[in-house]
Amino acid sequence: MAFTPFPPRQPTASARLPLTLMTLDDWALATITGADSEKYMQGQVTADVSQMTEDQHLLAAHCDAKGKMWSNLRLFRDGDGFAWIERRSVREPQLTELKKYAVFSKVTIAPDDERVLLGVAGFQARAALANLFSELPSREKQVVKEGATTLLWFEHPAERFLIVTDEATANMLTDKLRGEAELNNSQQWLALNIEAGFPVIDAANSGQFIPQATNLQALGGISFKKGCYTGQEMVARAKFRGANKRALWLLKGSASRLPEAGEDLELKMGENWRRTGTVLAAVKLEDGQVVVQVVMNNDMEPDSIFRVRDDANTLRIEPLPYSLEE
C-alpha cells in the first residue's frame, strides 16, 4: 500500500479525544463480487445479509462448523456484492475458509489492498468532514457513497467515521485535515473499538469463541430467523439451550505491561488470585490507564478486581454502551 500509515501517538479516551485522523493499517478490506454474492454470504455468516440495504453496515461472524468464529466482519454492500473490514491478522485464513465452497458459485472472493482505510473521530469530527463531502452518514443512513469513497457511521463510544477510499482521496483528506486534526495510527481506532465493546478478533483468538461469547447478539450481528449457515446449529443451541456462559467485558485500570491477545488475566478471590478469561485486545492510553477487552464468564460481579498476571496493579469492570439483556 503506497499510502503511508501515520506515526503512532499514545491513544486517548473518546471523551477527551481531539479531532483525529487515523490510518487503520491493522484492519484490512476484502470483497465478494458476482451474481451469487448475496446467496453465498447468506450461507456463510451469522447476520441476515439478504435484509441489508445500501444504507446499512453490520457486524457479522464467519464461523466454523462448531460455531467458533474465524473472524467477525464489518459488512456493507459494495458494487454488485459486499465488502467487509476485519483485522489484518485474520484476513488471509478467513478468506481461505470462505473460499472453500466458492467453486460451486458465481462469486469472486479477494483481498482488497488498493483501497485505503481511514478513521475520523474526536472533537467536531462531523463538522470537519462536512467541509469535504456533500453528504455524511448518520444513524438513519449509516453508509454513504460518494465517488470512490464509502463512509461508515459509528455511534459508539462517540460519533466517528470509517472511510474506505482510493489513494488519491486519502491523500487529499490528509492534506485538508492535517492542519486541524491530530494524525494517529490504528491503535487509536482500536482503543475506540474496545471502549465501544466491539469484539476484536486477531489471529491468536481465531477459531476460539462462539459469537455470543463476544456479545455479537447484543450488537445485532446474529439472525436467529435466517436459513442455514456454517455453524448455525451450535450458535442456535447456545441461545435456545442457554449453553453460552461467556461474555465480552471492558476492564480499565493500571498494568505494568499490556496483556497480549490470547493471554489470561487473574481474578481476586479473597486473599488469592485465580486465572480467568481470555484477552482479545488491550491498549495503553495517554493518561497511563490501560483498557482491556476480555472474554470471561458472563456472571462476573460488577465490583470484581482483576490484574494482568502477577502484576501489582489492578483492573476493574467498566460499563459497555449496550445491554446484554435479551
UniProtKB/Swiss-Prot annotation:
SUPFAM superfamilies assigned: Aminomethyltransferase beta-barrel domain, Folate-binding domain
GO cellular component: cytoplasm
Signal peptide: none
Gene name of the encoded protein: ygfZ
UniProt entry tagged with the keyword Protein biosynthesis: no
Superkingdom in the source lineage: Bacteria
UniProt-recorded name of the protein: tRNA-modifying protein YgfZ
GO molecular function: folic acid binding
Keywords, in A-Z order: Cytoplasm, Folate-binding, tRNA processing
Family: Belongs to the tRNA-modifying YgfZ family.
InterPro entries associated with the record: GCV_T_N, GcvT/YgfZ_C, tRNA-modifying_YgfZ, YgfZ/GcvT, YgfZ/GcvT_CS, YgfZ_barrel
GO biological process, one term: RNA modification
Chain residues that bind folate: W27, W189
Pfam families for the chain: GCV_T, YgfZ_barrel
The protein's role, per its UniProt record: Folate-binding protein involved in regulating the level of ATP-DnaA and in the modification of some tRNAs. It is probably a key factor in regulatory networks that act via tRNA modification, such as initiation of chromosomal replication.
Annotated source species: Escherichia coli (strain UTI89 / UPEC)
Keyword Cytoplasm: yes
Subcellular location as annotated: Cytoplasm
